[in-house]
């Protein structure tokens, strides 16, 4: 299997509407659905939800 098939690169976009993104890798076997993580958004200076963007 190729490296990118199991762990693709995904963008996590802020739900605060600032347009800030994080880039990470995800394991498709463990997380087949879209990721949602709480991370710091430096534009609004708060922890907000970041959702996977396709």
From Swiss-Prot:
Keyword Ribonucleoprotein: yes
One GO molecular-function entry: structural constituent of ribosome
Keyword rRNA processing: no
GO CC entries: cytosolic large ribosomal subunit
UniProt-listed InterPro entries: Ribosomal_bL33, Ribosomal_bL33_sf, Ribosomal_zn-bd
Entry superkingdom: Bacteria
PANTHER family for the chain: 54S RIBOSOMAL PROTEIN L39, MITOCHONDRIAL, LARGE RIBOSOMAL SUBUNIT PROTEIN BL33M
Protein name: Large ribosomal subunit protein bL33B
Naturally occurring in which organism (per UniProt): Mycobacterium sp. (strain KMS)
Gene: rpmG2
